[in-house]
Each structure stands twice: as C-alpha cells, then as structure tokens.
Amino acid sequence: MRFHGFHAATLAVLAVLAAHPAVAKTISVSSTTPDANEKLQEALILAKPGDIVQLGAGVWKLVDGLSLDVANVTVRGAGAGEGGSILDFTGQQGAGEGLLVTSDDVYLTNFAVLNTKGDGIKSKGADRIVYHKLRVEWTAGPKETNGAYGIYPVESTDVLIDSVFVRGASDAGIYVGQSKNIVVRDSIATENVAGIEIENSYDADVHDNIATKNTGGILVFDLPSLPMQGGHNVRIFENIVNDNSTPNFAPKGNIVASVPTGTGVLVMANRHVEIFDNVLADNGTANVMIVGYRYEHKDAKYQPLPRDIVVRGNQHGKAGYAPAFEGGAQIA
C-alpha cells in the first residue's frame, strides 16, 4: 500500500492508534446471558479510558440503540461475518442509530451491525476515530425504509475508515460529513444509493475501495447552509468504481435522490478534487460527472460551482450507454 501526499502523517498516527490502543482492562460481554443487551450497554457506559469492550461471538437481538461517550475505548468483536459478533437491530424501536459514539480516540473493530431503523454506526464530534473491519448491512437489500447511512462520522478530525463493508443504505453507505483529515480505504460499498460520500469536508483520501452496484459509486459534495463549508482537497484514487446500476431508492427530498442511476464518480460544488488511477467501467450514466449545485438556496457565502478539478490516468470501460436523466436517451 502506498501513502500519498500530505495524508501520510495523519495515516501514520491513526495506524499507531489502531495497532496499540491503551489498555487498562478488558470487559467481556456475551450474547448468551439472559440480560445480554443490558450488559452490553452497561459495558459501554462503565468503560474507562484505555479499556477494551470485548464482544463474544454470537447474535445480540437489540431493540434499543447503543451509545459510547467514553474516550480512548476499543470496542472489539470476534468477527464481522457469520459466526462473529452480530448486533441485530431488526426489532429496533424508534429510528435512532445502532451505535452512537460521541467521544475521542475510539477504535471500533471486528463486528457487524444489521438492519437498524436509522443509521448503522454514527460518530459525532469524535476525533481520531477508527472504523476497522466492520460490516453494516440491511439484509433485505435496497429499500427506501432502510437507514440512511451505514458508517457515518460527522464533525470530526482524523477519521480512518478501513476494511469495512456496507450494503443497503438509503442515502450513503460510507459517509463522512463536515470533517477533516480523512482516510477511507480498502472498503466495499454495494447496493447503497451512494456508495461512498465525502460532504463539506477537507483533506480526504479515498483509495483502494470497491464501489459497485450502487446508484452512484463515489460522491464528493459541498452543500449550502451547513456550519462547515468550502469542501476541498479530496483525492479519489486507485478505486474500482463499476456497475453502479441500482435504481435510486432514496426517500424523496434527500439530496442523493437526484443522483442518476449509473453514476460512477460525481463531484458537485467542491474545490481541489483529484480523480486518478481508478478503474471506472459499466456506469450507464457516466464514469465521471462534474456538476454545479443547481438548487435554490439563501446562503450568500456558498460557491455552487466546482473548481480546480483534475481527472487523470484512469482506466475507463464502457459508460454513458444509459444516461438516467432528462434527455439522456437522446444523447446515449
């Protein structure tokens, strides 16, 4: 794996955090005890900085969302696949997240979150957070009633998303919003509306991922009327972005509801974006689209046009054969 440019130092710091979390004690929880759900949330509440919350192999049938507000805690499962540590929210009451993290220096690894009513795993204001070897999935496939986001860090600095799998999100599978110093790598996003989305964020590297069978593969947006604006310095490289052919199933009114089926990479109103060394193929609308924000808004400081966009050295396969926008049939 090659490190590229100014993100190498950030990535090195995050790698140290991922490999060597400070250890005070290990709190082991099991899915087989009668009060398994309560014990799991209790462990997240009572953990001290440096602790590891160790999830045993098994399935938790959860009706309420979980939360973590303690800094420097590792939540580690026994695997994200079958036979691993599965947090199943099929019976969840309400529409909240599966897991909400609001503390710094948290390391999440080796477990799965299924069928949440709201977002899968969300972190807010959580700096130096690592999402590693996680699976977030809506197992019935694409549905408008699925949760909006799978992996969802927002308002954070130093974010590493590494080797995750997300399927079925009704907005974005992997979404990073209003954040800075971001790495998304070695992950798979499939059958979401947007596979990977970087929104209103600074200094992001998105590389060595697979975005396939989404409505749109990788999106880089900057939107008006948000606290953090002027998204810039985003690099999309060495990804496979192919066959993004899933019909758009976002709820009406969502910004991604306007993404045409068959979009590979879409840049909207961002600045300083590089798209290079990717494999782009079988995206019916276009492999790459660079567009302005065309909706009415009242934000006087907002810049709706993209600037300083570089597209180079990509491997292009078949594309543009079924553009899913008004007038597309006439130009295909």
Stretches found by the model and what they are:
Residues 1-10:
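Bacterial N-terminal signal peptides that target proteins for export
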Residues 28-38, 52-54, 72-118, 140:
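Right-handed parallel beta-helix/beta-spiral solenoid domain characteristic of secreted/periplasmic
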Residues 38-46, 61-70, 122-125, 230, ...:
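Short, T/G/N/S-enriched strand-turn elements that build extracellular solenoid repeat scaffolds
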